[in-house]
Structures are given as structure tokens and as C-alpha cells.
Regions:
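Oxyanion-binding "anion nests"
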Residues: 1-3, 14, 18
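A short beta-alpha structural unit
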Residues: 3-11, 31-51, 72, 78
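Short amphipathic alpha-helices in soluble, non-transmembrane regions
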Residues: 16-26
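Aromatic-rich carbohydrate-recognition surfaces in CAZymes
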Residues: 122-125
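Helix C-cap/helix->beta junction micro-motif
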Residues: 29, 61-62
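Zn-dependent metallopeptidase/amidohydrolase metal-coordination segment
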Residues: 65-120
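A generic structural signal for well-ordered alpha-helical segments
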Residues: 26, 58-59
């Protein structure tokens, strides 16, 4: 039996702790564990210039303040940030339900909204 587990976290040390726990549990069952393909952690900069631009653009275009949240998962920003330290970046996107499961769904109207928002942001830059 082979079990694949992609550990992800916004905090690198927490991801490593989780890997140690997984390793310990499988070791107690007499199994071996090998980790690969891991995403590096990424901590968003809440004082980011691009975040300020996008918040203003969203407010201007939609008449409400955007909902800015930090999620616990590792993101592609971790990979980019590892290769380009100090880059001002942000992660945003449409509404997705049940990610990484057979029931994963995207709310189609939010895809169009975020595409329009991306274009408006690029114009604002």
C-alpha cells in the first residue's frame, strides 16, 4: 500500500512539524514514509503595495470592501517567493468549494468577476 500526502502550510515550520507527526504515526504502524513535492510556506505581507492597489480597485469597481483573508495552505506564491525573495505578490481567485476532493467545485460567476478584477488591477498599476 502506498499513501501519498502533500503537506502544505503557510508557515514552513508548521509544515515540518506536520511531516514529523505523519512520519511518527506511520512508523508506529511499521510503515516507511517518504516526502516529496512539497510547497514551501508563504506568509502574505498585509502591508503590501499590490494589496493596497487591489483593495482600492475592488472598492472602486464593486462598491464594497474586499474580504481579505489568509488561508492555512501553501500556495504557488511560496514557490515563487522562494525563487524571488522580496517580490511583492498576492494570491486571489474565484470561490472554490471542497478543494482537492472529488467534490471540488468552482462558482462560475466568480471566475468572470475575478478576471474583470484582474484586468482592472493591471490598469491601475
Amino acid at each position: 500500500v502506498t499513501v501519498y500526502c502533500l503537506t502544505r502550510s503557510s508557515v514552513e515550520s508548521r509544515k515540518e512539524e506536520l511531516q514529523e507527526i505523519i512520519q511518527s504515526v506511520f512508523a508506529m504502524a511499521g510503515a516507511e514514509v517518504e516526502f516529496s513535492g512539497s510547497y514551501p510556506g508563504w506568509k502574505p505581507n498585509l502591508k503590501s503595495h499590490i494589496l493596497d492597489v487591489m483593495k482600492t480597485t475592488y472598492q472602486t469597481n464593486y462598491g464594497v470592501e474586499p474580504r481579505v483573508i489568509i488561508i492555512h495552505a501553501g500556495l504557488e506564491c511560496g514557490i515563487i517567493g522562494r525563487n524571488y525573495p522580496g517580490m511583492d505578490m498576492i494570491s486571489f481567485g474565484p470561490t472554490i468549494k471542497y478543494p482537492h476532493s472529488p467534490d471540488e467545485r468552482v462558482n462560475i460567476p466568480t471566475v468572470a468577476k475575478f478576471y474583470e478584477f484582474l484586468l482592472a488591477t493591471l490598469k491601475a498599476l
